[in-house]
Amino acid sequence: SCPTVAGSWLMVIRGLKALYGDDIPERGNIDVLMRDERNAGTTGVIASVATLLTGAAAETGFHGIGPAHRCKRQDLLQYGAASIDGMLVLKRRDTGAAVQVELNAGIIPFHPDMQALLPKAVSGYATPAEMQRFGEVWQERVRAILIDHADDDELVQIRPWSSA
């Protein structure tokens, strides 16, 4: 598992909860705006998680059924929305209500061992014991995001958003 995927999942789930309350979000009725371009940093990863949870897709998404394109998901995901402050915006197509969501993963620092382990692990120079320890501290951070801080408003920051 991955801290970026874990944080993305929390951002989308909590953003949808802010928009829908106890109602069930409707796939294909949600626009997703990404602040950055698709190839910037982890934007593509975050957008992939948002697509899985909301159905919103870029130009490659489902084009809909029949001449009216019912259930269309295509073009509901946009990149490079410079007008937003958060990492992403979730917008209901039925009501126009929208929230911008930001992840502050810095409140959950990596284990101190990670500073020495990460370069070795990604370059292929880590020993088997170092690789095992790398996996352990990596997963500790994922657990902290998904379990210990799942409801932490400092981790997932949600604010109302308007395009005006």
Predicted regions located by residue number:
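Non-transmembrane, aqueous-exposed alpha-helical and coiled segments at domain scale
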Residues: S1, S8-A164
